């Protein structure tokens, strides 16, 4: 199958904003895809090469890419760089370079999707001495044979800057449409395996029956079950039917651990493989998890010198560290508090009641200095739960989680079977979709940022306000450097950006607002932290903001409970 067909799909997707049309375009394309291509083409459609949980990365930035294109076309790298000032898009500039390339290959062959994918895999797997030169050569071979349109989208795939508006929800619907299967079965299979390639192949070859049989798989992370916020302990108990399990809500980073014999893999909430960053936790898990095979979930917490928990950003620093890991182990010691078990020795526990999963967790974990089972309390009494809540806060934790005793595990769902109780309104994780240049001494830096909430149905990010406070001068330098390559268009002092970067913000309140399509605006938002443990699709949704608005009004006594 020619790569040009995929490039033409990208072009059509980019030209329409209608979700149904995009879904139909992707579905029609998937129908034509050979069976042996289905495992990787869904990722290419998303503008990616590998699933989020795959450790492999291309490791190719703009300079390396331009070098490869210069080698393939005979056009000077500086000329390509200058062209970006006119086009505003490196993909467009590379397409122009390919269009007027000065050298032709006598052995040129049309690009196939399989060749492109296999070459990108080879690029990702090339490491060590001389790897940069090899990567340039592999990519140059592709651009040598590429049509201008192919070159444009190949460049965007390599840089991770595809702008076709295809998100997980749309791809899910397209798979269901293409192979005439139930969308809820596609959703379920994806939530259990986080692998669209696998799900698409099952949908085509085995239909609804095959999708219904999909189960948890070791080595493929399960989408995490999420919680809503409760107004109080009393409200949480009422929602849970009068009795609930309360456990400490730790201020850390959620992780999912897969054990297969002596092999341990740890995935972040974003489903990224963070195993190498936390070797001491991996070793402790080998001793702590008794079964041969298991999947458990917990919260990784950084511990200060006084034994109290540090803010979650310290854990993220551990995740980001690629070198001098032993040094970081001493500076930022970690502790893992486990709170759920989803799989044991070939048996999925997804459909098992929470109370039984908790008992199993306690049976299969041999606690040690680094690995604990989250402290909990099962009660019907508000007073007991409130005393536990007070103690959790005094210990430096965020608050409590309340869990329905008969709740099954619902991957990817943020329902009311799990509730969090905190002393303040929940902060929001939002995507930066635009920015405005500063003034005076900050004229060369972005001074404020336009915030977007995710709409999973359309894949869009809808504006909910602008944040300019809470940033240090160093923050603004870093954010400007990070965001400049993501500029899509400029309108005076305002720029619009590819929705890639997630930040955590606090705010005074959520207001209803006709000014924004989202219908909501944040009053006095303030920057708290960069959330590079989250991707754009992990950001808070419009629905979530609506829920928090209702909760806020309930707390103020304006809305009947």
Curated annotation (Swiss-Prot):
Catalytic activity: ATP + (deoxyribonucleotide)n-3'-hydroxyl + 5'-phospho-(deoxyribonucleotide)m = (deoxyribonucleotide)n+m + AMP + diphosphate
Top enzyme category: ligase
One GO term of the biological process aspect: cell division
Catalytic site positions: 249
The EC number(s) this enzyme carries: 6.5.1.1
HAMAP family tied to this protein: DNA_ligase
UniProt-recorded name of the protein: DNA ligase
Native source organism of the sequence: Pyrococcus furiosus (strain ATCC 43587 / DSM 3638 / JCM 8422 / Vc1)
Lineage: Archaea, Methanobacteriati, Methanobacteriota, Thermococci, Thermococcales
């Amino acid at each position: 199958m020619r790569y040009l067909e995929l490039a033409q799909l990208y072009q059509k997707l980019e030209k329409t904003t209608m979700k149904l049309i995009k879904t139909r375009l992707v579905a029609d394309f998937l129908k034509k895809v050979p069976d042996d291509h289905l495992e990787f083409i869904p990722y290419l459609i998303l503008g990616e090469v590998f699933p989020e949980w795959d450790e492999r990365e291309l490791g190719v930035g703009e300079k390396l890419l331009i070098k490869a294109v210069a080698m393939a076309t005979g056009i000077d790298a500086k000329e390509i760089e200058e062209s970006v000032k006119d086009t505003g898009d490196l993909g467009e500039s590379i397409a122009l370079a390919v269009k007027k390339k000065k050298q032709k290959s006598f052995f040129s062959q049309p690009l196939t999707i399989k060749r492109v994918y296999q070459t990108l895999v080879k690029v990702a797997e090339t490491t060590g001495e001389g790897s940069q030169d090899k990567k340039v050569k592999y990519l140059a071979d592709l651009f040598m044979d590429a049509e201008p349109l192919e070159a444009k989208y190949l460049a965007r795939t390599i840089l991770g800057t595809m702008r076709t508006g295809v998100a997980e929800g749309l791809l899910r619907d397209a798979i269901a449409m293409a192979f005439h299967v139930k969308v809820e079965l596609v959703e379920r299979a994806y939530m259990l395996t986080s692998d669209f390639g696998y799900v698409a192949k099952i949908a085509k070859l085995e239909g609804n029956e095959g999708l219904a049989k999909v189960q948890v798989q070791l080595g493929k992370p399960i989408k995490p079950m999420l919680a809503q916020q409760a107004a109080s302990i009393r409200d949480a108990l009422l929602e849970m039917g009068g009795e609930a399990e309360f456990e400490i809500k730790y201020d850390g980073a959620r992780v999912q651990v897969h054990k297969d014999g002596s092999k341990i893999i740890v995935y972040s909430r974003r489903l990224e493989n963070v195993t190498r960053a936390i070797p001491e936790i991996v070793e402790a898990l080998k001793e702590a998890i008794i079964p041969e095979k298991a999947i458990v979930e917990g919260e990784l917490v950084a511990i200060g010198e006084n034994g109290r928990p540090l803010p979650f950003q310290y854990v993220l620093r551990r995740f980001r560290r690629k070198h001098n890991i032993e040094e970081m182990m001493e500076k930022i010691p970690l502790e893992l508090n486990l709170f759920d078990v989803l799989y044991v020795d070939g048996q999925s526990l997804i459909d098992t009641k929470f109370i039984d999963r908790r008992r199993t967790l306690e049976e299969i974990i041999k606690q040690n200095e680094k690995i604990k089972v989250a402290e909990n309390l099962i009660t019907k009494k508000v007073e007991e739960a409130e005393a536990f809540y007070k103690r959790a806060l005094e210990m430096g934790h965020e608050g409590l989680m309340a869990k329905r005793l008969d709740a099954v595990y619902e991957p990817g769902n943020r329902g009311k079977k799990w509730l969090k109780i905190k002393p303040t309104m929940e902060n929001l994780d939002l995507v930066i979709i635009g920015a405005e240049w500063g003034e005076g001494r900050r004229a060369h830096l972005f001074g404020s940022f336009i915030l977007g909430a995710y709409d999973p149905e359309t894949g869009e990010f809808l504006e909910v306000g602008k944040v300019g406070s809470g940033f240090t001068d160093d923050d603004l330098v870093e954010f400007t450097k990070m965001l400049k390559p993501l500029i899509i268009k400029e309108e005076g002092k305002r720029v619009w950006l590819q929705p890639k970067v997630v930040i955590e913000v606090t705010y005074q309140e959520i207001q209803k607002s006709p000014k924004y399509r989202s219908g909501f605006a944040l009053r006095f938002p303030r920057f708290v932290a960069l959330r590079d443990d989250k991707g754009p699709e992990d950001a808070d949704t419009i629905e979530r903001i609506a829920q928090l608005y209702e909760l806020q009004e309930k707390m103020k006594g304006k809305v009947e409970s």
